[in-house]
Amino acid sequence: MSEETTKERKRPRQRTRASKNGEAFKKLRVIVLCHEDLVPPDTIEGLSAKEVAPFKTEWDVISTLKKMGHEVSPVGVYNNLGVIGNALIEQKPHIAFNLLEEFHGYPLYDQHVVSYLELMKQPYTGCNPRGLTICRDKALAKMVLAYHRIHIPAFAVFHMNRKVKRSKRLKFPLLVKSISEEG
């Protein structure tokens, strides 16, 4: 990093104010990363619950952070990390609140957004890239849990386009799930 870049990344000291219990807390600059279609409007006044439903989580997070006195900027992301990079440069956030569940339409790519935040040395909320990778692979997650003697239901992995032979240790009723899809 050049000297000029280092100077740009220095953050000014923030004002503090008292919380309800009298403790002081720091006013933070927060960027909220969310899908570009889910960036909520400035107000939901006059909108029905059905209209608010798609971006309810984003609205709740942003409005709560603002009510707590933080400076909040939503950042809509679809397939361009440059949008996040620009927000980091322009907003100089203390933290990124990560609400992204996918990148470029792929849920498996959300871990790469978090990796980018780590490369940029940007503090963020949520799980680190390794944790996201493990959690996205149900079989791997179950193997890690079993290794640590955490009880889990019996499972088996069946590969696509291959004949399925049920293991005797699997008893009916059975649930069939994709190894990498949510749900």
Model regions: which residues?
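Active-site nucleotide/adenylate-binding loops and adjacent lid/helix of ATP-dependent enzymes
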Residues: 27-34, 89-90, 134-183
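Hydrophobic targeting/anchoring helices
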Residues: 2-29, 40
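A short, GP-enriched loop/loop-strand-helix hinge that lies immediately N-terminal to
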Residues: 43-48, 92-136, 151-154
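Glycine-rich, highly charged phosphate/nucleotide-binding loops
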Residues: 73-92, 107
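Glycine- and acidic-residue-enriched helix-capping/strand-helix junction motifs
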Residues: 39-57
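A structural preference for short, hydrophobic beta-strand core positions in alpha/beta folds
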Residues: 74-76, 126, 157
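A generic structural motif
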Residues: 65-73
